[in-house]
């Protein structure tokens, strides 16, 4: 397992009076300037509060949206600073930039146990370009570095990788530590049987994770739009369902690899089909060998839900990445919601349940069972890349234990 130094290894003596640059992920959804979901801000609180309690001067840096290296007023972090102040119960000093003399002056006047929030890092092109001069300017206002932004750990940016060349120590925050513990633990030393559920619309976006999981898991459940590429590869009629014609050979090879490795490979046996892609489309449930021409599959059927629930019974660990159907449409959310509820029940009986980022997180939140899972990953692409066994630059840059 990637054994990295963590904030937990730092004492009050290490931190009191020190300027700590903390890379956080405050890329929260906004509606007319109001935050609609503050989950990402709350996820960073354990790290921020720990540093404050040890007398550090905390300097927070985050990206927000995609301003592409220019100042975009609607992407300023002011609403985030206001919400963070409410959650911490103390004022947050808001900077109008993330580098420069004004920022340096504001940080210099911070008391021990004070917090400053830098302006959107991506207002500077040097952030995503991992420009050494920009990274050096960020680091100039700090003594040590904490990365707690798992969602951007798969990117080598100035604030995730570049700054580590100018600061020491460089450690993981509690959020990243938890992500590594669960996601890597599930791949490297899982409580067995290990069952992986992979959904979503395209096989192409999940090839790496499926191939890695076939080497690790005992059962692999496939759902979502990608199932139709597997059906077409088996010679079945898929109607108007989404099929990646250039991935048919790959689908065949993945099924063959599962057989060769003794991994139980489960595809749905029935699907809910619709006459068009709309929330109010006409729908019917059919066997996968009876999909009518002109209809498209938008969810797994009730028999498949039952089969998948039986396959999950008694498992030690479940990793779930990607919905079972078009869960944004209530009519086609039944399969995804049933799996979410099953995982909540399994967690209560001792199964380790890991929701691996992206749409599956939105699904468990929609059903209201997010709190009942063992771990919900805060990364989309980062979660997938970690599960694929890839090196994440933002993690690799941290100090080894």
Swiss-Prot record:
CDD domains given in the database record: Phosphoglycerate_kinase
Record PANTHER family: PHOSPHOGLYCERATE KINASE, PHOSPHOGLYCERATE KINASE 1, CHLOROPLASTIC-RELATED
Subcellular compartments: Cytoplasm
Family designation: Belongs to the phosphoglycerate kinase family.
GO cellular component terms listed in the entry, alphabetical order: cytosol
Entries under InterPro entries matching the protein: Phosphoglycerate_kinase, Phosphoglycerate_kinase_CS, Phosphoglycerate_kinase_N, Phosphoglycerate_kinase_sf
Binding-site residues for substrate, renumbered to this chain: 25-27, 40, 63-66, 122, 155
Cross-referenced HAMAP family: Phosphoglyc_kinase (MF_00145)
Molecular function via GO: ADP binding; ATP binding; phosphoglycerate kinase activity
Complex and partners: Monomer.
Leading EC class: transferase
Domain of life according to the entry: Bacteria
Gene3D superfamilies, sorted: Phosphoglycerate kinase, N-terminal domain
Catalytic activity, reaction form: (2R)-3-phosphoglycerate + ATP = (2R)-3-phospho-glyceroyl phosphate + ADP
Protein name per the record: Phosphoglycerate kinase
Protein residues bound to ATP: 206, 297, 328, 357-360
EC numbers, comma separated: 2.7.2.3
């Amino acid at each position: 397992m990637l054994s990295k130094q963590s904030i937990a290894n730092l004492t009050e003596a290490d931190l009191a009076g020190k300027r700590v640059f903390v890379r956080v992920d405050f890329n929260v959804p906004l509606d007319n300037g109001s935050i609609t979901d503050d989950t990402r801000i709350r996820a960073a609180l354990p790290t921020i509060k720990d540093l404050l309690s040890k007398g550090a001067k905390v300097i927070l840096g985050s990206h927000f949206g995609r301003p592409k290296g220019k100042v975009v007023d609607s992407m300023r972090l002011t609403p985030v600073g206001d919400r963070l102040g409410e959650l911490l119960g103390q004022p947050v000093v808001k900077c109008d930039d993330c580098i420069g003399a004004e920022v340096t002056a504001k940080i210099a006047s911070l008391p021990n146990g004070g917090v400053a929030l830098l302006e959107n890092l991506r207002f500077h092109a040097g952030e995503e370009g991992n420009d050494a001069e920009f990274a050096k300017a960020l680091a100039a206002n700090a003594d040590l570095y904490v990365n707690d932004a798992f969602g951007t750990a798969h990117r080598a940016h100035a604030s995730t990788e570049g700054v580590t060349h100018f600061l020491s120590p460089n450690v993981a925050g509690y959020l990243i530590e938890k992500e590594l513990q669960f996601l890597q633990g599930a791949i490297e030393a899982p409580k067995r049987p290990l069952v992986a559920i992979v959904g979503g619309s395209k096989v192409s976006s999940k090839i790496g994770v499926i191939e890695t999981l076939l080497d690790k898991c005992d059962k692999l459940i496939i759902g979502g739009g990608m199932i139709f590429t597997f059906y077409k590869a088996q010679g079945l009629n898929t109607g108007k369902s989404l099929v990646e014609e250039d991935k048919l050979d790959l689908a065949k090879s993945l099924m063959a690899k599962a057989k060769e490795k003794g991994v139980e490979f489960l595809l749905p046996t029935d699907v809910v089909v619709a006459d068009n892609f709309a929330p109010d489309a006409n729908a019917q449930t059919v066997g996968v060998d009876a999909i009518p021409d002109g209809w498209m599959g938008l969810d797994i059927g009730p028999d498949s839900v039952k089969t998948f629930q039986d396959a999950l019974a008694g498992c030690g660990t479940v990793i779930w990445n990607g919905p079972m159907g078009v869960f944004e449409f209530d009519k086609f959310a039944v399969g995804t919601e049933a799996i979410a509820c099953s995982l909540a029940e399994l967690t209560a009986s001792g199964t380790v349940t890991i929701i691996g980022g992206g749409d599956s997180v939105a699904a468990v939140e929609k059903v209201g069972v997010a709190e009942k899972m063992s771990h919900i990953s805060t990364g989309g692409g980062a979660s997938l890349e970690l599960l694929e066994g890839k090196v994440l630059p933002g993690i690799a840059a941290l100090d080894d234990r």
